[in-house]
Amino acid sequence: MVGGGAKRRLRGEGPQCEKPVDMKKSKSCEADVPGDLRKEVESHYRLPLPEDFYHFWRFCEGLDPEQPADSLSASLGLRLVGPYDILAGKHKIKKKSASLNFNLHWRFYYDPPEFQTIIIGDSKTQFHMGYFRDSPDELPVFVGTNEAKKNCIIVQSGDNVFAAVKLFLMKKLKEVTDKKKSSLLKTIDEKLTEAARELGFSLEQRTVRMKQRDKKVVTKTFHGAGLVVPVDKNDVGYRELPETDASLRRICGTIVEAPSDADRLQAFAPVQEMMTYVQFANDECDYGMGLELGLDLFCHGSHYFHKVAGQLLPLAYNLLKRNLFAEIIEAHLANRSQDDVDQLAA
């Protein structure tokens, strides 16, 4: 039978602005963005957004007051999208924006419900950055990047958007040979670094808060960003899958490459067996097991796993009281596209 889950440390949420002062509700920490605009963004997405989201918008307004969303296009090839489209008023131009599902807006093929795109880059690789939350009622735990045309891997890039863009910029700076371009990047880097320092945002790729989260990760999952679920002192909350990641990948490969439907059905047997284990796990409140299997099958990407992922994931999210994530995965699986991700496109 399957084993118990990994131990979990106490949950610790760090302040959003890491300044050496009491940060309970420091006004200096709050970006100058109108309250009604904040409400509009958060009501469309039904997700809380961290203060760095708004501060970065103000920073981009400083670079280009007319087109803040495109202020990094010429220099870095980056564009602010997703919830930033609401700050830019783009949703007001679209006639039927009221009926749009914003949680599918810029949701790329491999983006799990935990991931919310805020910046896009090279369209050839579908590079994008997004906030990653473990639960829809919590603030993001880090900013991740993914290249959807390549794979499902989510790379952790700091715990705020300033850090993620800084890391991207530093990489770009190493690749640039043109002096003029290099000079432009250095100027932006100076402004970005100064703004982050003034606001108290860490520019580290892996902050203390992110390392604290690592201790709570029960399993890495195929996307590599890790899975965090509540596990009590008796180890209830998660149990391991009976297959390693490598063997699960092999099983998935055998299913996808099966020469006939009969062979495919046969190759599905280990997955069916794991689904039975998940039912036992759910009965005993180890909800993390079904979530892990569902996410792994979703991240594998083949349409052959959409039905199974559609059975496992909404149930797991609802059992974990992450109901919005259940809604997102159902909508995404029903409209999973490799290209049409801009919901506001005409």
Swiss-Prot record:
Its cellular-component GO annotations read: chromatin; nucleus; site of DNA damage
Q: What InterPro entries does the record tag this protein with?
A: HPF1
Q: Which GO terms describe its molecular function?
A: chromatin binding; histone binding; poly-ADP-D-ribose binding; protein ADP-ribosyltransferase-substrate adaptor activity
- Region Interaction with PARP1: list its residue ranges: 242-346
Q: Where is the composition biased (Basic residues)?
A: 1-10
Which positions carry ADP-ribosylserine?
Answer: S97
Q: Which residues carry this modification: PolyADP-ribosyl aspartic acid?
A: D235
Where does this chain mainly localize? nucleus
Q: Which residues carry this modification: ADP-ribosyltyrosine?
A: Y238
Which residues catalyse the reaction?
E284 (proton donor)
The record's subcellular locations are: Chromosome; Nucleus
Region Disordered: which residues?
A: 1-29
What keywords sit in the KW lines? Answer: Acetylation, ADP-ribosylation, Chromosome, DNA damage, DNA repair, Nucleus
Sites of N-acetylmethionine modification: M1
Biological processes, Gene Ontology terms:
DNA damage response; DNA repair-dependent chromatin remodeling; double-strand break repair
Positions of post-translational PolyADP-ribosyl glutamic acid modification: E240
Bias (Basic and acidic residues) ranges:
19-29
N6-acetyllysine sites (modified residues)? K19, K186, K233
**What does this gene product do?**
Cofactor for serine ADP-ribosylation that confers serine specificity on PARP1 and PARP2 and plays a key role in DNA damage response. Initiates the repair of double-strand DNA breaks: recruited to DNA damage sites by PARP1 and PARP2 and switches the amino acid specificity of PARP1 and PARP2 from aspartate or glutamate to serine residues, licensing serine ADP-ribosylation of target proteins. Serine ADP-ribosylation of target proteins, such as histones, promotes decompaction of chromatin and the recruitment of repair factors leading to the reparation of DNA strand breaks.
Which family, according to the similarity comment? Belongs to the HPF1 family.
Instruction: Relate the assembly described in the record.
Output: Interacts with PARP1 (via the PARP catalytic domain). Interacts with PARP2 (via the PARP catalytic domain). Interacts with core nucleosomes in a PARP1- and PARP2-dependent manner.
PANTHER family according to UniProt: HISTONE PARYLATION FACTOR 1 (PTHR13386:SF1)
What's the protein called, per UniProt? Histone PARylation factor 1
